[in-house]
Amino acid sequence: MLEQGCKGFFIMAEGSQIDWEGHDNDFYGQYDEIEEFENAIESALAFAKNRQDTLVLVTADHETGGLLIEKDTLRYKETNQMKVSWNTAIGKGDHTGAMVPIFAYGPGSANFTGILDNTDIFFAMQEAIGINDLPDGTCY
């Protein structure tokens, strides 16, 4: 259904419950919601891997609760057999100023490396899909 449009499509999937669980300082609730969000990401990547015209971006608009995976929790360096011990710390359930990651896969993904101001993501997306300097009020 999505592939029928001649100009392509845009999908935004939000893992809002991750944020809500952070407000509640519920680590296990966050973990469950992160697993569900990971399933959505895996579906998007499976679609993108069969195409040359699909960019997948994953980021957050903020961090909530101060969830930390503390130093020295990774017990094995073998990445294909990595085990994690969850030594976690939770803050006070508010939004924080912590930097959040951005992950990109597909054409234009090189525009999403390093540390970005979140307002620059819009312009990097424009460049990735070849839309630059739209006149005011123009819809694509």
Question: What are the roles of these predicted feature ranges?
Answer:
Residues 1-140:
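A post-motif C-terminal structural segment
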